[in-house]
Amino acid sequence: MRAFINKLFLIALSGLMLLINSPALADSNSKSPEIIKTSTNIIKQHQKISRESAVKVIGLEGGHGSGAYVKLNGQYFVITAKHVVGRDWLFLIEGSNKEESVVGQVIYRSPTKDIALLRVPRLKNRKPAKLQETEQKDMAIGEELVYSGYPSSYELLTSSGIVSGYENWGESVLVQGWAWPGSSGSAVFDENGNVVGLVIAIGLEKFRGSAQLIETLVYVVTIDKEEMKAIKKISK
């Protein structure tokens, strides 16, 4: 059963990358709806932090995901999903509205979770977020979470959701929210404004022989004790 679930989600993630690269979604000439580009209208502090730290992680050969700008041991990094970086080492990191672009180098890929870390120069137009060690069991049913990222061809979008359940696959937390291709790697914030996890996938169901994405069922991986220990060690 576990093998079947893993296979199912590998298919889901592959599908997400294909959608990211599809002309209909990634056409640079396509027009996006008007997006709030400042945090002046944001009421909650954790929503503001989510937006101010969010970055786009762009592959040198195309495709993109999302991530968050963080500071560890006096140095600067971007945390994202491991499947966003794949086996590549260098990525273009963009801030909101393409105000700033730098090159990020992958320095850590988790051996057990969908988490990766890139070293980056200091970004002038981004504010670093704080990582919070969080176990799956620490995420309470009904807890409100917020995350910001770059789905499809859109600029920065902020979403919120609530913890609705747990999944053994990848020790994930299931969030009733919203995500789409390109959202992978978005940092998930608790109400205290701390990064407690990352968006790694959305639901996938088979219906009449075809696979259908469930954009409102978001899979989140937490930054647990072992991950935090490894991240702190590699960031020294």
Predicted regions and their residues:
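Catalytic nucleophile loop of clan PA
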Residues: A68, W178-V199
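Catalytic-histidine neighborhood of serine endopeptidases
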Residues: P23-S30, L72-N125, I141, A201-G203
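Short, solvent-exposed secondary-structure boundary/capping segments
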Residues: D114-R119, E171-G177
